[in-house]
Amino acid sequence: MAKIVGIDLGTTNSLIAYLEGGRPVIIPNAEGSRLTPSIVAFTKDGQLLVGEPAKRQAIVNAERTIRSIKRHMGTNYKVKIDDKEYTPQEISAMILRKLKRDAEAYLGEKIEKAVITVPAYFSDAQRQATKDAGAIAGLEVVRIINEPTAAALAYGLDKEGHQKILVFDLGGGTFDVSILEIGEGVFEVIATAGNNRLGGDDFDERIVNWLIENFMEEHGINLREDKTALQRLYEAAEKAKIELSSKLQTEINLPFIAMKGNTPLHLSYTLTRAKFEELTYDLVEKTKEPTERALKDAGLSPSQIDKIILVGGATRMPCIQEWIKKHFGKEPQRNVNPDEAVALGAAIQAGVIGGEIRDIVLVDVTPLSLGIETLGGVFTKIIERNTPIPVSKSQIFTTAADYQTSVEIHVLQGERALAKDNISLGRFILDGIPPAPRGVPQIEVTFDIDVNGIVHVSAKDKATGREQRITISNAIRLSEAEIKRMTEEAKRFEEEDRKRREEIETKNQAEHLIYTARKTLKDYGDKVSKDIVQKVEDKIKNLEELIKPERINVEQVRKGMEELTQTLGEIGQFMYQSAGSTAGNPGQGQSTENPGGKTIDGDYKVN
């Protein structure tokens, strides 16, 4: 059976893991790192770069470099490069394809199935978008699993006894907090809460704003208007944030950040940890409300939590750790890698699905309430948040006007009282209802949430017993045709990548052959005829012309290499013929005659 991998598709970094001997293992990427930056870039010459290569060129190619695309999943946001627009699903698929390709090279086998993690507070549209990204990348997404739940699996794989654990997950772009009961192989989520618009990126943004304001005050130049300068600021801000987790202050130096007239300007500021915490105080405060809500929903006090697991690189910030320690009265666990726990947990869930791990039961919950819009724009909940999934619930609805033959049902996710303040999942049109006074028709609408947290809806007219099809009109979701088209485009990118690698390899081989040919002429040019030397030089020039363009013709270059190789062979042939002619001349050296044609034994003496 082919391996099922676990993937943490993160805002800042992504990871892929698999199960080896019953233990989850992170797979390094082609660059040798366990973390792959979630960055995609399109170079001006048409190359697609993903991960570290994309990150390295971001400063000089800021307008064509995309980062933190996860924050736009489930929206109609588009990235425009040249004349083409890309959805968040397509950009995410490029990251997934990089992980898939590197893992296949590492494992030496094809990968077709994956468990992919999402923030616990992801909506239905965001979860569906993640599945679509997997499909575009050529992966069958066998399960969507919540990130805090995955981290709990990684923590609790070998733990004995019953524990109540709280997973505090502050990633690059999202924040989740989940409370679980674990014991005897059962991992049961009892409450979850979060904020999909809060993460490490927001802390970086505060540093960037501070730098821009200081520079504006000092020099009167707004660095936000220069995309290259802005890219440098974001990279410096992220580095400063990381350094302040272990140091009390950090120096931010960016030479030649701008020009004033003909004078280059340099940015140089000292940021202390105290100032950073002042700049980001309200962001830390935003983690408190979801944490309190999760505790309230679970019916627990902070003192009843046995262990606290920190997930996501942003949890390394001292301000976060200090708040947790103060609120819960205990130190968070230090034996879980915040960057890797989610991917490791996804690999464990993949092992459960693949039958490699048998004694684990995972019970997750829906993070948001599910319901419909009713008369007056009110949100009526059908499935409450923190309901264990999978789940199916039905409710009877009726018409609001006399002789109404169709109804529109607006399905939403959220916790607000009014429909307009919640997340719209779609509008369901049910027609063919027999005309009757208002309030008489009975329409049973069933809401299902599957193990991936994705919502499905069906409806039945109780009067006729006839089941009706409901049309979902959600512009954010991709149709099967769109997914197929994007998958084909992704394959074309992969083919283009293959061609590009082939061109580079062929060009390298040609350059090496040219070097060898020139060295051969230098060493033996005076020992062969001028005609042969001229032929070799002509073939070298021809090959040099063929490899001059940015995009070479591989077949022509290979033909040029073959011709040069054959011509070099003439030098070797000429040298051997010359050597043979010299050896066969009896007038040179000792006689080659053997009188009598007999074998002559050699005498030797040992002293």
UniProtKB/Swiss-Prot annotation:
Tell me where in this chain the PTM Phosphothreonine is found: T174
Name the keywords, alphabetized. Answer: ATP-binding, Chaperone, Nucleotide-binding, Phosphoprotein, Stress response
The molecular function terms in GO held by this entry are: ATP binding; ATP hydrolysis activity; ATP-dependent protein folding chaperone; heat shock protein binding; protein folding chaperone; unfolded protein binding
On the tree of life, the source organism's domain of life is Bacteria
Q: Which Gene3D superfamilies match?
A: 1.20.1270.10, 3.30.420.40, Actin, Chain A, domain 4, Substrate Binding Domain Of DNAk, Chain A, domain 1
Induction, per UniProt = By stress conditions e.g. heat shock.
InterPro entries assigned to the protein according to its UniProt record, in alphabetical order: ATPase_NBD, Chaperone_DnaK, Heat_shock_70_CS, HSP70_C_sf, HSP70_peptide-bd_sf, Hsp_70_fam
Q: Which GO terms describe its biological process?
A: chaperone cofactor-dependent protein refolding; protein refolding
Compositionally biased tracts (Polar residues):
577-594
Q: Which Pfam families match?
A: HSP70 (PF00012)
List the residue ranges of the region (Disordered). 577-607
The stretch of residues making up the signal peptide is: none
Please give the family membership noted in the entry. Answer: Belongs to the heat shock protein 70 family.
What the protein does comes down to: Acts as a chaperone.
Q: Which NCBIfam families match?
A: PRK00290.1 (NF001413), prok_dnaK (TIGR02350)
Report the protein name in the record. Chaperone protein DnaK
Q: Which organism is it from?
A: Dictyoglomus turgidum (strain DSM 6724 / Z-1310)
Give the taxonomic lineage as stored in the record: Bacteria, Pseudomonadati, Dictyoglomota, Dictyoglomia, Dictyoglomales
